[in-house]
């Protein structure tokens, strides 16, 4: 082949350098499938600016965005799960724990902290769905109880953000025991008059929804969160019927009276502060309009 033929036989694309786009710069919305700039999405608290879909958010990031800057202090950060049953399904439970810890950088699926919200003392907790589906095992139960006890000690509100597939099957009855354990400590809080607010996020299912997640003095949900005991596919397979549109979503539950309110993530911080100031008889951190009677 002559030199001139070699030049013209080259593909136009072979001389074009591909753009080197670092991984993680762009994120596709799981609802509308719009491609979003990741930094913009992070600034928007992982809510799609195009369609308003609330994506899942890292538990630690959620709590740090909620609390006043530099006010957070972690509770029971040293607790780690143990494979006391030597459980094995397709993989050893011990290996699943190690993989989840490596992937998330967390020791288990619940993060608990003290801090302030608009200068009001508060105890907070959040489930990390990325850690084994946010499942509740012995450590999750223990950390929840320690957080509740801290709230009673400080006489301040406790707010928990749930995102879980339910009890952790690899811990068998030890995980189911956490349902009673967490419910019992909330009963103690109620006796002492310490407020507990439960915020249900997508998804909140199984043993978590059947215990502490639905036991708030006020039960709040994020928009379109999936909330229930069994998931919709399991229910459809059991009853052999098509479920109503939006069944088990937060809007459906609000309509049926199962939850108290739906709050957008961007409004969560201000809403919680306003509600907690009323529950604790403290001045509101915001200037609220005076109520005017109809006959005035």
From Swiss-Prot:
GO biological process terms, semicolon-separated: fatty acid biosynthetic process; malonyl-CoA biosynthetic process; negative regulation of translation
Catalysed reactions, semicolon-separated: N(6)-carboxybiotinyl-L-lysyl-[protein] + acetyl-CoA = N(6)-biotinyl-L-lysyl-[protein] + malonyl-CoA
Lineage: Bacteria, Pseudomonadati, Pseudomonadota, Gammaproteobacteria, Pasteurellales
Summary of the function given for this chain in its UniProt record: Component of the acetyl coenzyme A carboxylase (ACC) complex. Biotin carboxylase (BC) catalyzes the carboxylation of biotin on its carrier protein (BCCP) and then the CO(2) group is transferred by the transcarboxylase to acetyl-CoA to form malonyl-CoA.
Top EC group: transferase
Main localization (coarse): cytoplasm
Residue span(s) of domain CoA carboxyltransferase N-terminal: 25-294
Binding site for Zn(2+): 29, 32, 48, 51
GO cellular component: acetate CoA-transferase complex
InterPro entries reported in the protein's UniProt record: AcCoA_carboxyl_beta (IPR034733), Acetyl_CoA_COase_Trfase_b_su (IPR000438), ClpP/crotonase-like_dom_sf (IPR029045), COA_CT_N (IPR011762), Znf-ACC (IPR041010)
UniProt EC number: 2.1.3.15
Protein name from the UniProt record: Acetyl-coenzyme A carboxylase carboxyl transferase subunit beta
């Amino acid at each position: 082949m002559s030199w001139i033929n070699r030049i013209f036989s080259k593909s136009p694309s072979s001389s074009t350098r591909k753009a080197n786009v670092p991984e993680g710069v762009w994120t596709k919305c799981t609802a509308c499938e719009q491609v979003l700039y990741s930094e913009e999405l992070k600034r928007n608290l992982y809510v799609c600016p195009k369609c308003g879909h609330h994506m899942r958010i890292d538990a630690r990031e959620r709590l740090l965005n909620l609390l006043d800057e530099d006010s957070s202090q972690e509770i029971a950060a040293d607790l780690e799960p143990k494979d006391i049953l030597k459980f094995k399904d397709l993989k050893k439970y011990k290996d699943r724990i190690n993989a989840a810890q490596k992937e998330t950088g967390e020791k288990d699926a619940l993060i608990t902290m003290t801090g302030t919200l608009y200068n009001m003392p508060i105890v907070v907790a959040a489930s990390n769905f990325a850690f084994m589906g946010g499942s509740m095992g012995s450590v999750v139960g223990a950390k929840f109880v320690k957080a509740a006890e801290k709230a009673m000690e400080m006489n301040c509100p406790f707010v928990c953000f749930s995102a879980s597939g339910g009890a952790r099957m690899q811990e068998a009855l030890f995980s189911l025991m956490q349902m009673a354990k967490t419910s019992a400590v909330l009963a103690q809080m109620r006796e002492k008059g310490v407020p507990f607010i439960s915020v249900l996020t997508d998804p909140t299912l199984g043993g978590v929804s059947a215990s502490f997640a639905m036991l708030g003095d006020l039960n709040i949900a994020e928009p379109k969160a999936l909330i229930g005991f069994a998931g919709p596919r399991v229910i459809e397979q059991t009853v052999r019927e098509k479920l109503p549109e939006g069944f088990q979503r937060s809007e459906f539950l609000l309509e049926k009276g199962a939850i108290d309110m739906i709050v957008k993530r961007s409004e969560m911080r201000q809403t919680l502060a306003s509600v907690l100031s009323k529950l604790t008889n403290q001045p509101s951190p915001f200037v609220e309009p005076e109520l005017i009677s109809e006959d005035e």
